[in-house]
Amino acid sequence: MNDFVFSDIPDNVKPMASVEFDDPLTIATGDVLNWTLWLTRNFPALSSIIMRLPSSLVSMVTSSFEGANQMVQVKTSTHNLYSLSLPTHARKQIISQLVEHEKNHIGPKSKDCVMQRLLNAHRDSESKISIPTPDATLRSEAVGFTLAGTADPPNILALGTFMAARDSEMQKGLYKELKAIWPDLRSPAPSYNLLHQLPLLRGIIKESIRFTHGVATGPARLVGAGGARIGGYNVPAKASSFSAAATSDCS
């Protein structure tokens, strides 16, 4: 998901660079996924007020907002996680740092990633936007994509792994494909473009996506006696429906 949103993630926060997956971005993203998502979804005004309060005050009541604070608030600290274009006395929220890194880092950029598309939207001859996308919008989109991408991929990959584990021939074929391009597991993971060329791996992931529904939040509801129309589809009476996490899709 990070590669989909950004062209480049600094090495010190890349999940695959940490054996324990304890980099700041992964920890903060995981900590955000708790009951506060329900609060944000159902009481956005209250959630907004809480996020504007000093984090030290909120932490006296609950620690559930600490992940969100790391992601979307600015804190003062003598520790500077990123040295690139940031003063040593300030540690900006992780998302802001990633957005600044995307804008300022020297190196190849993926024109198709979310951030580059937003940064260059005003340069598109067909675009109705003539000014650069504001940083606040970039941060908002980055947070939305980053958090939304933490729910469904694990669900999809868990199903794919389970199904592949039931077929020994599929396991052998998949292992052979991966071993050919990644002989040493201690070395950095292959690039997305290289993995995308593996036909069996790509097929397993596509089928896993096809068979997996979104992560449900809240209890399922039964459609009333008269049926209902949801998302343009006629749903019969007594059918179970639920809302998928973060996306509000109905299944």
UniProtKB/Swiss-Prot annotation:
Obligatory cofactor(s): heme
EC numbers, comma separated: 1.-.-.-
InterPro entries from the UniProt entry: Cyt_P450, Cyt_P450_sf
Keyword annotations of the record: Heme, Iron, Metal-binding, Monooxygenase, Oxidoreductase
Keyword 4Fe-4S among record annotations: no
Signal peptide bounds: none
GO MF: heme binding; iron ion binding; monooxygenase activity; oxidoreductase activity, acting on paired donors, with incorporation or reduction of molecular oxygen
UniProt xrefs under Pfam families: p450 (PF00067)
Pathway where this protein functions: Secondary metabolite biosynthesis
Protein's UniProt keywords contain Heme: yes
Superkingdom in the source lineage: Eukaryota
List of residues binding heme: C250
UniProt cross-references to SUPFAM superfamilies, sorted A to Z: Cytochrome P450 (SSF48264)
Family: Belongs to the cytochrome P450 family.
Known function: Cytochrome P450 monooxygenase; part of the gene cluster that mediates the biosynthesis of pyrrolopyrazines, secondary metabolites showing insecticidal activity. The role of ppzG within the pathway has still to be determined. The single multifunctional NRPS ppzA is sufficient to produce peramine via condensation of 1-pyrroline-5-carboxylate and arginine, N-methylation of the alpha-amino group of arginine and reduction of the thioester and the cyclization to form an iminium ion resulting in release from the peptide synthetase.
Name by which UniProt lists this protein: Cytochrome P450 monooxygenase ppzG
Phylogenetic placement of the source organism: Eukaryota, Fungi, Dikarya, Ascomycota, Pezizomycotina
Gene name in the database record: ppzG
